[in-house]
Design a protein with these regions (language model features):
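Conserved acidic donor-binding segment of nucleotide-sugar-dependent glycosyltransferases
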Residues: 163-173, 181-186
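Conserved catalytic-core segment of nucleotide-activated headgroup transferases in glycan assembly
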Residues: 44-113
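Conserved acidic donor-binding loop of glycosyltransferase catalytic domains
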Residues: 150-153, 159, 167
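A charged, aromatic-enriched C-terminal amphipathic alpha-helix characteristic of glycosyltransferases
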Residues: 184-218
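Carbohydrate-associated surface elements
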Residues: 23, 42
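Acidic donor-binding loop of glycosyltransferase active sites
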Residues: 118-134, 147
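Membrane-proximal helix-turn-helix segments that form the acceptor-binding/catalytic region
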Residues: 1-17, 30-31
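Short alpha-helical segment that forms part of, or immediately flanks, the ligand-binding pocket
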Residues: 117, 139-145, 158
């Protein structure tokens, strides 16, 4: 009943729908006749104006996974790929947690977002093999910092910003190959790092977000 109410409310009470991902756009287009637009996830840059983005040599030779070790975040997939970089794999503390995961990953405690970005800045590699279409803020944060993030193509921030290290859902083999190449090929790492920052500036800045938003609401 709740889902039926939700669908009816969308049809009656909204003028248009914003989604984060291409796959979401198709879903809502099929559910309702309302105009549906992709509006990218947003990173607020002002709190980070004093954050100095670290270089390759300033970062630890280790990986952090997006989400945590739970099934919801496909933590096992991320962990298997991240182990190609280092035996020590870090993961943020999340609302959904897996019993005993602290024995497998080094948990990052809940901290303010600005502190989180400073902490993320210390890692050389990132992995986020999430199978669910979500906002993609982890991949977005990594792109801002120039950290290559291996992940599945279902999330737009992953497939657009980190396209050289994006794989189809379930392709663990290809993801592990890319991890090994990032680890062993410095030229490839530098190329990906540069490209993700360049694409962030091209597609995901606050100015681009606002431009797209006002283009829709002013119609």
């Amino acid at each position: 009943m709740l889902l039926m109410w939700y669908a009816a409310a969308m049809k009656q009470n909204v003028d248009y729908i914003f989604t984060h991902n291409f796959i979401d756009q198709n879903y809502y287009k099929g559910l309702t006749n309302k105009p549906t637009h992709i509006l990218q996830s947003l990173l607020i840059e002002d709190p980070l104006k004093d954050l100095e983005i670290k270089t390759y040599d300033q970062r630890t030779n280790s990986a952090i996974i997006g989400g945590n070790f739970s099934q919801w975040y496909s933590g096992f997939d991320s962990y298997i790929v991240a182990r190609e970089f280092s035996e020590n794999v870090a993961a943020p503390s999340m609302g959904r947690s897996q019993h005993g995961e602290e024995q497998v990953v080094q948990k990052v405690p809940h901290i303010q977002w600005k502190d989180w970005m400073s902490h993320l800045n210390s890692f050389r590699y990132a992995v986020h093999m999430m199978r669910t279409a979500a906002a993609g803020t982890f991949s977005l944060n990594c792109a801002y910092l120039g950290i290559p993030c291996i992940g599945y193509s279902i999330i737009d921030t992953q497939s657009i910003l980190h396209k050289e290290v994006t794989v189809q859902v379930g392709d663990i083999g290809r993801a592990r190959q890319l991890a090994c190449r990032l680890r062993d090929d410095r030229e490839f790492y530098d190329h990906v790092s540069h490209q993700v920052q360049e694409r962030y500036r091209r597609f995901y800045t606050e100015e681009i977000f606002l431009k797209k938003f006002y283009e829709v609401v002013s119609q």
